[in-house]
């Protein structure tokens, strides 16, 4: 599903532990790291997509996490021209994302990247909250900065 402007609806997942660190995942067979993310199907809400992607990419269930916050609006990034599939219709030029800040409330041993037939990640680690800004691919950096900045105050609030 691609909107009229060419952006694919998507959710981004910032999973935190009790130390305030975030889960940083390595793309399979690459030296590229990112937060888990994935598309929103036509019949899904962003929250539905969050839980589906969380299970597919990280192996966690709804009961393993607590939602702390979600970005107010959509955050957009454009794909570099070399990644745009110019022969696909409708043309997708980027992603528009709702970002969720989650707290892991179960044991971290529940994190599994290999539960699907086509895993997206082959490794993960806990990193400091702002660490991803200096590590993510350049074209996603501004969206990461905006999401982390907007959601940071909720990390400090313990319900």
Swiss-Prot record:
Native organism: Pseudomonas fluorescens (strain ATCC BAA-477 / NRRL B-23932 / Pf-5)
PANTHER family the UniProt entry points to: M7GPPPN-MRNA HYDROLASE (PTHR23114:SF17)
Keyword Ligase: no
One GO term (biological process): mRNA catabolic process
Residue numbers covered by motif Nudix box: 38-59
InterPro entries the record matches: Nudix_hydrolase (IPR020476), NUDIX_hydrolase-like_dom_sf (IPR015797), NUDIX_hydrolase_CS (IPR020084), NUDIX_hydrolase_dom (IPR000086), RppH (IPR022927)
Protein name: RNA pyrophosphohydrolase
Domain (Nudix hydrolase) ranges: 6-149
Organism taxonomic ancestry: Bacteria, Pseudomonadati, Pseudomonadota, Gammaproteobacteria, Pseudomonadales
The family this protein is said to belong to: Belongs to the Nudix hydrolase family. RppH subfamily.
Top-rank taxon: Bacteria
GO MF terms, alphabetically ordered: mRNA 5'-diphosphatase activity
